[in-house]
Regions:
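Residues within the helices of the helix-turn-helix
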Residues: 7, 18, 48
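Short, charged recognition helix plus adjacent turn
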Residues: 8, 28, 33, 40, ...
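DNA major-groove recognition helix of helix-turn-helix/homeodomain DNA-binding modules
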Residues: 45-60
Length: 67
């Protein structure tokens, strides 16, 4: 299972979801879907924008866990 740790990174960066959505160029609703793990996928361009906005690596946002 893939776990999305956007909330963890937001807390570390003291950034709001709305601010992140604006920086990345996605809607707050789409960011919410991603944060809750309900997204079926994520574009590399979105992942890249998330990493740039949060000053992190993809592995800081996405984590694989055995079921």
């Amino acid at each position: 299972m893939i776990v999305v740790n956007v909330d963890v990174m937001l807390a570390r960066r003291k950034m709001s979801s709305g601010e992140l959505a604006q920086k990345v160029g996605i809607s707050a609703a789409n960011l919410s879907i991603l944060k809750t793990g309900k997204a079926k996928g994520v574009k590399f361009s979105t992942l890249s924008a998330l990493c740039e906005a949060l000053e992190c690596q993809p592995g800081d946002i996405l984590e694989f866990r055995q079921d």
